């Protein structure tokens, strides 16, 4: 996950 992309994947 990244700064504003904390999703399962």
UniProtKB/Swiss-Prot annotation:
Q: What does this protein do?
A: Its target is unknown, but this toxin may modulate voltage-activated calcium channels (Cav) or calcium-dependent potassium channels (KCa).
Protein name, entry field: Contryphan Le925
Recorded domain comment:
The cysteine framework is C-C.
Q: Which domain of life is it from?
A: Eukaryota
Q: Which UniProt keywords apply?
A: Amidation, Disulfide bond, Hydroxylation, Ion channel impairing toxin, Secreted, Toxin
Its cellular-component GO annotations read: extracellular region
* Primary location: secreted
Location comes to: Secreted
UniProt lists the family membership as follows: Belongs to the O2 superfamily. Contryphan family.
Q: List the disulfide bonds.
A: 1-6
Residues annotated with 4-hydroxyproline modification:
8
Cell membrane found in the keyword field: no
């Amino acid at each position: 996950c990244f700064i504003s992309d904390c999703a399962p994947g």
